[in-house]
Amino acid sequence: MKTFLKKLYLTKIVILLYILITGNYYTELDFIITSEKPKMGWLCSYTPLELIYAAGFLPYRIDGHSNPARVADSYIHPNFCQVVKSTIDVAIEGGYNSLEGVIFVNSCDAMRRLHDVWKRYVPTKFIHLLDIPMGQSSLGLKYIRKEFEKLKIALEKYTSHAIQDDSIEEAIDLFMESRTLFHKINFLRLKNPPQITGKEIIEISSDFFKSDPLLWNANIKTRLENEWKDTPDAIGNTKPRIILSGSPIHDAEFISFIEECGLDVVYEDLCTGSKFFDLNINKSKDLLNALGEAYLYRIPCARMMKIEERAKHIVEMSKKFNTKGVIHQSLKFCDVYLYDVPRLKELLVEKDLSVLFIESDGTLGSLNQMKTRIEAFSEILRN
């Protein structure tokens, strides 16, 4: 343990010295050793983490940074979202050099262009692009199964090892345990006030995205037993409870900012929050088909063009978590989410949910511009 801590402190010192000397803030700050497994980068929630883990890799979610872009505009059109541009920043400046490879998904045009830039300018041993269908149908299931099979073959070719069904099944069990544990944490938000904040939830999910699930599961079990004790509802808590929906949010400070404006965020309809863990895999003899079915039929994001299903899910979660309203946030240039706003708002208002739409550039510097609107929304919900 002492040896590990020494290595940890030395790593932090080296990183700080590097930042001071070069002025480069996009270093490998996240690569604190949590596993001996090589890391495989991924970006989209439709990426089958179980296949990556079964192949012997640690799935590592790529999330860029929360500052204005520095170099991305030299490689890609400026009218792309902060997620893509910040990821290019970190990649170009070497922040992801420790990754063994990256698995992309054709989730939107910006992500496809990110794949193109990465493939050309970022030296990476393994790059794979998953073509996920937009339709939730029997044909779509056949297609996504074929795509998962292509990924499996590509990983086997790269590692020179066959991915056995036993390994896939073990990975499924491991990640399903992670999802179950997350739901146990999420249930703490049913209390009034919530026993855990939205900021803490995003921090916990972010840890999951970059940790070995074996270690993450053990840590969460310990925290559930010791840290999160059952407490009665508080009397007189008047903070309105809301759902946060929209584009991906990786920085917990964004959630913290909303909560500081007088709201309790109790569910995230986000691919980086609660919704990410709302996935159930029914194992069968054909494990690739089981994975394909689970991922294809998960609660859809805007990219899947299932706006009625998304609205229905938000309404169901609103009833479950007893919320009064929804903040739907979208990144600038995030076309798939911006396109949905008018119809989604209409569907939610029909169900007596108040909706606030906010658009940001994805940087923490833009938060103060939204403060007045969020505080006003909080007052409306109180009354």
For each feature predicted by the language model, list its residue ranges:
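Peripheral docking tails and interdomain loops at the edges
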Residues: 2-4, 11, 342-383
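A charged, amphipathic alpha-helical module
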Residues: 2-38, 145, 149, 153-279
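Metallocofactor- and cofactor-centric catalytic cores in central/energy metabolism, strongly enriched
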Residues: 20-28, 33, 41-45, 49-50, ...
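Redox- and metal-dependent alpha/beta enzyme cores, enriched for Fe-S-associated oxidoreductases
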Residues: 44-63, 245-317
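Short, charged, surface-exposed secondary-structure boundary motifs
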Residues: 68-77, 136-141, 274-281, 366-368
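Glycine-rich, highly charged phosphate/nucleotide-binding loops
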Residues: 76-93, 303-316
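Acidic/His-rich segments in extracytoplasmic proteins that coordinate ligands and/or metal ions
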Residues: 86-157
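C-terminal hydrophobic structural anchor segments
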Residues: 307-351, 356
